[in-house]
Amino acid sequence: MPEYIVFVMPPEGEDAEPFDIPEWGYIEAIATAERYRAHGWKACIIDYGTPFVLWRAKCPDGDAISVLARTCDEACIRARAVSEDYDSFQRED
């Protein structure tokens, strides 16, 4: 079973969906994330088995959305795919 997941989000305009890449070691996960980042993708490393939770993403103008993600980094990537203005992230427990 993999120990890490690399979540990747394609750059705007790419005809691709975000997806997870399983990795068995941290060094491999870092290499995978860096390889995608070098091509303009956003990427973050997540411990395997981390559950999805709701995160609240807010803009300075007060607009907010809920994002289902495993980590704050993943929530940030997902919310900023909607708008770069989201700059405040808080877990909704």
Per-region residue spans from a language model:
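Short aromatic-glycine-(Arg/Gly/Cys) micro-motifs in beta-strand/loop hairpins
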Residues: 1-18, 46-64
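A short, charged, amphipathic alpha-helix used as a generic interaction element across diverse proteins
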Residues: 23-47, 68-90
